[in-house]
Amino acid sequence: MPKHRKQSKIKIYRITNYKKDKRSELDSNKFELEQQAVENKQDKQGKQDNQVQSENVVIVPTDSHNLDIWDEISLKEIQAGEHTNLFAEQSNYQNINLLQVSDIRLYLDKQLQFSSVDEQIYHEALVHPIMSKVIDPKRVLILGGGDGLALREVLKYETVLHVDLVDLDGSMIDMARNVPELVSLNKSAFFDNRVNTHVCDAKEFLSSPSSLYDVIIIDFPDPATELLSTLYTSELFARIATFLTEDGAFVCQSNSPADAPLVYWSIGNTIEHAGLTVKSYHTIVPSFGTDWGFHIAANSVYVLDQIEQLYVVPTPRTLPSLLFPLFQFKEEHLEQRNFALLNSESNLILHQCYKKEMEF
């Protein structure tokens, strides 16, 4: 899941109230979230904030202009109040805090990674479009995703016979396998016989010969540093494409088309420069305070043909059955494609774009 998010100039929305629902399967405390479509006319863009509402989640504006600061403040507030520390460790790569309040929250380096109230929105959007489009996916590779939540969604497909999950931080995988509350949330995904875990750098894993995959899911951290920017080069995307079957595809989390359009569209542009066909989409994630974007890519045009008209099976709990709305963008967001850049090993610039768009 993305590690960094925008220090936003617009109002950020935070989840402040939760109601338990015995019917939900979202997490161990059984919360229910129903995402409703939000329409906001362009001529009123400057007059009103997007409102995200659901039966069980109340979203209210906060005066914070810095989401990273808000994450750190919210973590301190939780730790000062009544809560349960489920897991706390300084690994070789990051500070990990998994806490339980009314929900379960994961913080990495004091930045919110997910809330159990709405993490399913992000993970269903990441996984289900590509898994439903690729015909009978049998072999899946997940790069990142050590919490097991994307893995949980992949394992819902009975056609899947083999999954390789690669994560740099072994502590993340240990937490996802051993903390009961997270095991409940990820549905014991790491104990499925189809799953093979690899604690190593993704580029190291991709440097070795391997069998091909029908689906590859890329859940890297955002390109906040020059090192992380190397995970989003045209060369690496081209390398990843060589691991795809003829009818295979990969999906990449790509930040927010609303808050970080240069980063979002530059990732898509970089994938295209690697010689792939790309389809772009997004969905609203309330705990992120914005919508979040993804790019699906394939070696052949026909693989992604008419994906917008696809009905997702198994039916997600937070996505529309028909994917068409996810592939629709506001005109002002689409216009930002004209400024998209190419990120390559010889010209690493994505982290600079990221830092510029994160500035207040």
UniProtKB/Swiss-Prot annotation:
Residue ranges occupied by any PABS domain in the UniProt entry: 68-299
Compartment(s) of residence: Cytoplasm
Binding residues for spermidine: H123, D147
CDD domains xref list: AdoMet_MTases
Main location (coarse class): cytoplasm
InterPro entries xref list: PABS, PABS_CS, SAM-dependent_MTases_sf, Spermi_synthase
GO molecular function: spermidine synthase activity; thermospermine synthase activity
Enzyme Commission no: 2.5.1.16
Alphabetic keyword roster: Cytoplasm, Polyamine biosynthesis, Spermidine biosynthesis, Transferase
Record: active site: D219 (proton acceptor)
Residues where S-methyl-5'-thioadenosine binds: Q94, D167, D201, A202
GO BP annotations listed: spermidine biosynthetic process
Pathway: Amine and polyamine biosynthesis; spermidine biosynthesis; spermidine from putrescine: step 1/1
Subunit structure: Homodimer or homotetramer.
Family: Belongs to the spermidine/spermine synthase family.
Name of the featured protein: Polyamine aminopropyltransferase 2
Organism classification: Bacteria, Bacillati, Bacillota, Bacilli, Bacillales
